[in-house]
From Swiss-Prot:
Residues 399-477 form the PTS EIIB type-1 domain. The gene is ptsG. This is PTS system glucose-specific EIICB component. It catalyses: N(pros)-phospho-L-histidyl-[protein] + D-glucose(out) = D-glucose 6-phosphate(in) + L-histidyl-[protein]. The EIIB domain is phosphorylated by phospho-EIIA on a cysteinyl or histidyl residue, depending on the transported sugar. Then, it transfers the phosphoryl group to the sugar substrate concomitantly with the sugar uptake processed by the EIIC domain. The EIIC domain forms the PTS system translocation channel and contains the specific substrate-binding site. The active site is at 421 (phosphocysteine intermediate). The modification Phosphocysteine is found at residue 421. Residues 1-388 form the PTS EIIC type-1 domain.
Length: 477
């Protein structure tokens, strides 16, 4: 049962990656536009701010589409059904409150009864995905034949959304109130504790690929801010971009991603065996540069997470502590996607005490380096370059590596589903016993996570391109 739940949660995490992928463009537009840089004409700033804000305003709908695609093998009909389901769900909530419960229209507007945010989008996406998987092959009488098959999915999704909306209209005020209480606590009353917990749990979930689920409420939901033209923004990311001076509580990510983990990578390089130091150095420097520039840290983390779990536990604790440290020092910087140098510079318009980030960051990097170096050498941890020699095979391009990955996964017929997120391949296989974990690592995977029939292989930022190469290879054999 646990494996089935875990597999489902992995699908949820994967499906949330598509809507999250629009955050960079939304963040850049809103962040730069709201900063009103003197070099940019005011009319251009206003256009950028409003277009970026419109993306954030429509994030619930974007999440609905993303969830629907994630659970329907990227079928466009499910995405269309999600749009229908979300629209009907929201309007049902408003109609019930106004016409059945006789709630005053101004009260509905002020208390946002129909604004169930990202959760509403996820619910609508789940409805459409479920209906797609259940009814996309349905057969109807000949006189209704036009509506058979996939055309039936938007219809049944919309009808079911009315039913769900009726139920939510009765229970949402209570649920929404509790969510609002948590939101107020996390964003305004005690952000130090809230974001300490956020950072610790977020890193703890990375090995399982479930951290995207945990990110959503903090990044996209907590807090509320209304700008000068009446646009309302939720979540720490959008509020910061829009100019909310109480946002920016996610700033701690810059400390451990840009400085802390590169310090750990340096320690792994320096503690490698002398004969392996050159090879490990090139790998770790590349991974550290990726983390510094883009905030993508899995290539470093998976280099020690499986061989030295104690290092990852300490890393998760240090990552969690970086958030309250920045809040305590009143350091604020914005992120649109991940905490890297690109975000740090591009979104610096609303930053506060920006000069402290490299100072605190370098200190954090030295702390990481010292702890990792001490533990690796004292307890002889088998981090990269300290283990027995491995026959790692290096390939010049993704087309060359694709056949070997398919073979390591048990062959074409053993692969039931193949997908990729930012840093890892996500595969569902028929027989897990046919998967050769060691070969996947020898092919360059920084780590391999197996649970039930699910396999995750961490190939870093190459993962999406490798997935495309594997798809092309499978289609041609």
């Amino acid at each position: 049962m646990f494996k089935n739940v875990f597999s489902s949660l992995q699908k949820v995490g994967k499906s949330l990656m598509l809507p999250v992928s629009v955050l960079p463009i939304a963040g850049i537009l809103l962040g730069i536009g709201s900063a009103h840089f003197t070099l940019i004409p005011e009319i251009i700033s206003q256009i950028m701010a409003q277009t970026g804000g419109s993306i954030f305003s429509n994030m619930p709908l974007i999440f609905a589409i993303g969830v629907a695609l994630g659970f329907s093998n990227n079928d466009g009909v499910a995405a269309l059904a999600a749009v229908v389901a979300y629209s009907i769900l929201i309007q049902t909530l408003s109609a019930v409150e106004l016409n059945i419960l006789n709630t005053d229209a101004n009260t509905i507007k002020n208390k946002n009864f129909s604004d169930i945010g990202i959760l509403g989008g996820i619910i609508a996406g789940a409805i459409s995905a479920y209906m797609f998987n259940k009814f996309y092959k349905i057969q109807l009488p000949e006189y209704l034949g036009f509506f058979a098959g996939k055309r039936f999915v938007p219809i049944i999704s919309g009808l079911f959304a009315i039913f769900v909306g009726l139920i939510l209209s009765l229970i949402w005020p209570s649920i929404g109130n509790k969510i609002q209480i948590f939101s107020e606590w996390a964003a305004y009353q005690n952000p130090i504790i809230a974001f300490s917990l956020y950072g610790l749990v977020e890193r703890a979930l990375v090995p399982f690929g479930l951290h995207h689920i945990w990110n959503v409420p903090f990044q996209m939901q907590i807090g509320e801010y209304k700008n000068s033209i009446g646009q309302i923004f939720h979540g720490d990311i959008a509020r910061y971009m829009a100019g909310d001076t109480t946002a920016g509580n996610l700033s701690g990510g810059f400390i451990f991603k840009m400085y802390g983990l590169p310090g750990a990578a340096l320690a792994i390089w320096h503690t490698a065996k002398k004969e392996n130091r050159k090879k490990i150095g090139s790998i770790m420097i590349s991974a550290a540069l990726t983390a510094f520039l883009t905030g993508i840290t899995e290539p470093i983390e998976f280099s020690f997470i499986l061989v030295a779990p104690i290092l990852y536990i300490i890393h998760a604790i240090l990552a969690g502590l970086s958030f309250p440290l920045c809040i305590f020092l009143n350091m604020r910087a914005g992120t649109s996607f991940s905490h890297g140098f690109i975000d740090f510079i591009v979104l610096s318009g609303h930053s506060h005490k920006i000069f402290l980030f490299p100072i605190v960051g370098i200190c954090y990097g030295l702390l990481y380096y010292s702890i990792f170096y001490f533990l690796i050498t004292t307890f002889n941890l088998k981090t990269p370059g300290r283990e027995e020699n491995k026959n790692t095979v290096f390939f010049r391009n993704n087309i060359e590596i694709a056949p070997y990955i398919v073979e390591a996964l048990g062959g074409k017929n053993n692969i039931k589903n193949l997908d990729a997120c930012i840093t890892r391949l996500r595969i569902t296989v028929s027989e897990i016993s046919k998967v050769n974990e060691e070969n996947l690592k020898n092919l360059g995977a920084a780590g391999v996570v197996i649970s039930g029939s699910g396999v995750q292989a961490v190939f870093g930022t190459r993962s999406e391109n490798i997935k495309t190469a594997i798809d092309e290879y499978i289609n041609n054999i």
